[in-house]
C-alpha cells in the first residue's frame, strides 16, 4: 500500500466528523499483541459523548467496508482523546494557552528534552512554557519544529 493507512482513513473520516461539527484529533493504526487496532479520536469544545462516538464509528465502518483499504483484520475504536489529549496541530497549541502541557523535544534545549508546565505563549513558530523549579518560575522557548510530541498534562 503506497499510502499510509492513517492517511487513507483520515480522508474517509474527516467529512464524517465535519458533518457532525466535531474535530478529528488523531488516528492510530497499531498492533497490540496479535490484534490490530484502528483508533480514531474525536472531540469538540464541549467534549464528545457515546452517541457521537457511535455515529462516527457506524458511518466510518460503512465507508471502510466499501473501500476496504486495510488488508488485515482490525478492531475499530472511536473515542475522545481523554484529559491528556495530544497536541498535534498548531491550532491545538493555540486552543491550549493557559493549560498545563507535557512536551518532549527531538533534541535538548538547555540540556533538557522533557518540559512540563503552563503553555504561556504560542506565536506559530515558538511555544513558550512556564515551568516551576522549586519556587522559581522560568519561561522556556521551544521551537515548534523541535517538538517530538506534546499533550495536555493533568496535575493534581
Swiss-Prot record:
Pfam families in the record: DUF150_C, RimP_N
Disulfide bonds: none
RNA-binding among keywords: no
GO BP terms: ribosomal small subunit assembly; translation
InterPro entries (UniProt xref): Ribosome_maturation_RimP, RimP_C, RimP_C_sf, RimP_N, RimP_N_sf
Subcellular localization: Cytoplasm
NCBIfam families: PRK00092.1-2
Name by which UniProt lists this protein: Ribosome maturation factor RimP
Native source species: Bacillus subtilis (strain 168)
